Amino acid sequence: MVKVIPGIRTYVSVDGGLSDNPRPSLYDAEYEALIANRADQRPDTVVRVAGAHCETDTLIPELALAAPRPGDILAVQATGAYNYAMASNYNRFPRPAVVLVNDGRADVVVEREPLADLIRLDVIPLRLQ
């Protein structure tokens, strides 16, 4: 989602956030990113990249991009060696897949966590059924 607040800033909201990338909130980690499906276009807009969670979810506070549009693919080229190990199910978000991109090829190296895995240990006491 792209939200423009005239005279203030432009927000780009992404599917992930604090649960799969806690480093910006915990350590002020800094990232670079680009619009992968339009990587050949010159940046002309400064945006704030925000995650899908309700608080403390600014991933990149200031990023120059080609004017973002809904449906664009935002690629963060590197997020750190321990990023996946630090991921959580905060707000009941499943963990995303991990994709290795090398020599022009992309391979899934960790599959996306299915919702069924998030709720498999949940129980409803018999007295409440």
Predicted regions and their residues:
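Charged (often Lys/Glu-rich) extended helix/loop segments that serve as interaction or gating elements
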Residues: 1-129
